Amino acid sequence: MKRSILLSLIGLVIIASGCSSNTYSRLRDQEDRLIANYISRNNLQILKEEPSIDHVWGEKEYYKVTGVDNFYFHLISRGDSVRYDTISSTRIDTVDLEIIANDLIVARYKKFGLTENADTLSYWSTLDQSYPYEFHYTNLSECEATAWHLAIRLMKYPESVCEIIVPSKLGFNAEQSSVTPYVYILKIKVKQ
């Protein structure tokens, strides 16, 4: 009797785990459709190859990042090759200073959903949030949103601004667990 109850419970656990992965699969399919609908609704032009550094981005041009499902990047502003001395608050002018691993990134952002009447979460200015989001570039333990690190690689320079379409698997933990894609407008500086 105990053995048949135990086997029944094991069977239920196996069935339940199979159902939850099917649900996750359906959620991922819905996410893919939501991203495709957003691209279509906004008439975005998708570039298949990474643009050169001096490419002038059209307003609706987005690069579909090679090797990453449903991650799209649009450069709004290239930024400059200037860094700031945080102690004296003076500019340190340099030529073509690219962001490198472990640079301390200071980020401001706006985040909104892909539905037509999506809510917006803004950390764009001190009116929205007193302190910006800070993390070291390429350190996923400080910023688990892989999409941000991918975007910074493409932004290349401090003071850059971009817009990214982020599937849940590349987002923050809360986005990953809810299988919710977002669009971010991301503005970065490098703090020394």
Which residues fall in each region the model found?
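Short, glycine/small-residue-enriched coil/turn segments at secondary-structure junctions
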Residues: 63-65, 71-106
